[in-house]
Amino acid sequence: PIEFIFEAKQAVIEQREVGVDTKTYARGLRGALRQLPHVIFVGEMRDLTSMSMALSAAETGNLVISTMATQSAAQTVTRIIDSFPPHQQPQIRAQLALTLRAVVSQLLLPRQDGRGRVAAREFMFVNQAIQNLIRDDKVHQITNVIATSLRDDMLSMDDAITELVDKGLVSYETAHPLFHDTEKRASLQKRVFRAAPLAGEGGSR
């Protein structure tokens, strides 16, 4: 179902609901491509067909924006590639390396003060290094590239979570199982427990 109705202000926006305006995601995408759009938003890439159509649309020069139920940029890339049969995966890696521009991943974590949740976000912008990793089937190294690419405005999930803990928004107990880099987790643990007041400090001896 359509969850948000976008108001057309400086552009023509057409929204299609699966089951009402089109029978499937694939048919909806094919119909959209015939209208020569500038931007295509796919609510969620659920299956091989929708992923294949989205990649094909991106290859023709369209900006394609979509969502997936993943927790990191590397996991997103892996999910797309692994959705295809093994004999197609080299081709998909090549397509993805050429067309993917960015991945924003989000985790909603419980706030330390109990007032709802706060978002930790990872930002990956595809540069030459990440293109090569995708093409060469070395997706597992993407997280390390993100962590060392601050000049390219990237931010790893580990660093995003660390910022939330340092600001007092998320507890270390909530954060520590989510870390990819064990050294960063250990460094954060030392800071957190060094900053905490010692039991009985300042009392009589």
Regions found by a protein language model. Name each.
Residues P1-R205:
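Short, flexible helix-loop junctions that flank or precede catalytic/ligand sites
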